[in-house]
Regions:
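Extracytoplasmic mature domains of secreted or surface-exposed proteins
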Residues: 1-172
Length: 172
């Protein structure tokens, strides 16, 4: 869709998302779209629940080039100002490596080893606040520490002690 709301005829995604659904999208400054969800294919290509699409509608082959992606749903995305993307959901691996429901991707779609976090249950939403990320979900532990359904993480993935509650919400 163009900025004025009209259909962009140059966007040609082929068959698009072949299975599952899209749960979240972010648009990068260069016009590329990153989508996440329960889908495993885009335009007939396996994408592992996260895909970056060029403005023309075709898969960006430089994003997570050849990686398997997430082994389960990716329900939330948060695009950082530096172009890195925090993802959350119900996955336990990304590209065959163990990650428990949250990780940050580099600009090329590969895992960012400088962000280390985990949750014991599904993450449903992410919100960037300053240099950190607020995480909401159905979890009771984050990084092995009691964090009931909501927690603020620092840029490294550690719990922000200035915004921390062990009682949390009754449901998010």
């Amino acid at each position: 869709i163009n900025a004025n709301g009209t259909l962009d005829a140059s966007f040609a995604p082929g068959t698009g998302f072949n299975s599952g659904y899209v749960a979240d999208i972010v648009v990068q400054p260069d016009g590329k779209v990153v989508a996440s969800g329960t889908f495993v294919n885009f335009a007939g290509t396996a994408v592992g629940r996260v895909v970056r699409i060029n403005p023309s509608g075709v898969i960006d082959p430089t994003f997570n080039n050849g990686g398997a992606g997430a082994n389960n749903w990716v329900l939330a995305l948060a695009l950082q100002p530096d172009g890195k993307i925090v993802i959350g959901g119900s996955f336990s691996t990304y590209n065959g490596v163990a990650y428990s429901r949250i990780l940050r991707l580099n600009t090329d779609g590969t895992p960012d080893a400088s962000f280390v976090a985990s949750a014991n249950n599904t993450i449903y939403d992410l919100l960037l606040i300053g240099s950190g990320v607020f995480v909401c979900g159905n979890f009771t532990l984050v990084n092995g520490t009691a964090a009931i359904r909501g927690v603020m993480l620092n840029a490294s993935g550690t719990i922000d002690a200035s915004f921390y509650s062990t009682t949390g919400a009754n449901g998010v």
